[in-house]
Amino acid sequence: MSNAPLLTFDGVSRHFGGLKVLQDVHLEVPQGGIFGLIGPNGAGKTTVFNLTTGLLPVSGGSIRYQGQDLAGLKPHQITRTGIARTFQNIRVFKEMSLLENVMVGMHSHLRYGAVGLLASSGLFRSEERRARDRARELLSWVKLDHKAGDIADNLSYGEQRKLELARALATEPKLLLLDEPVAGMNSAEKTDLMVEIRNISARGYTVFMIEHDMRFVMGLCEHIAVLNFGRIISRGDPDHIRNDPQVIEAYLGREEDEAGGDAALVEGGAR
């Protein structure tokens, strides 16, 4: 595996009128493993993902993926380079089966597209068969293959999150962006998803996640960067982040820091 970073932010800024959401952000996501980006509400974390996936242009600096500058690329073009994303708000097709949901995720890599696959015309049957086999395999990775024919709306909240993971993987990415993957989950669902993300990472995918649940992040990520008021204020492993005074202050302020600090940062949370 190359030592070169998979994703690089080099002096990236993003302004909305006079509002500076990101300022001179330098960030490197290494190949392999699980990288976390954390920070207080309004720090600019989601903007980092929106810039990476082409939903917004940068105001300054550059973003490179595998050495390629992403400037000017449309979201679907960025997907084809090998970047996939899930969103904080679940976006599954609730009236479609799990299998169909995952097959739709394959459209950018199929000769006939998703509509052709779902139409099951004779011209598309060979490709459809391969796509269905791959979709079932991806569902098995998140332990949903036994529900492949079920309607997505009948899944639990946690299962819909896992379906989103499978659909994102269907685009054949190298880099998987997870936007608050455990938002709204209970403790058991979080533990289950942590296992699935570790399994995905072990298969060779690079995972880059934004998450507010500090225990989840500290228990899962090998590398973490902290964003505050649009600037990176700390980077390192969980132990470094947990004990960095700048990070504690960013989350709590000086007065609360002096009163004892944040338990999730200090204890490190789930293992």
Where do the PLM segments sit?
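Glycine-rich phosphate-binding loops of nucleotide-dependent enzymes
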Residues: 2-271
